[in-house]
Amino acid sequence: MRFFSLFTFLVAFIAAALAAPVEIGEDLFALRPTGAKRDIILMMPVCFEGEKLNKDQTKCIKA
């Protein structure tokens, strides 16, 4: 009985997410508030003291 209710909840959750408009569905699965700012996050290395980023900003080099 417990499995059936959990399964029903899961099916209802997926159906609601698929039936929602695209923006709401994206926000639901991204776990961010609706209307949140969508920025591209760039993964830049963090350099130690005495180092700096190279021209491509992909590696740390000694200054």
Curated annotation (Swiss-Prot):
Coiled-coil regions listed: none
GO cellular component: extracellular region
Signal peptide: 1-19
Main localisation: secreted
Residues cleaved off as propeptide: 20-42
Tissue: Expressed by the venom gland.
Localization in the cell: Secreted
Residue pairs linked by disulfide bridges in the UniProt entry: C47-C60
UniProt keyword Nucleotide-binding present: no
Stated name of the protein: U-reduvitoxin-Pr9a
Organism in which the protein naturally occurs: Platymeris rhadamanthus
Lineage: Eukaryota, Metazoa, Ecdysozoa, Arthropoda, Hexapoda
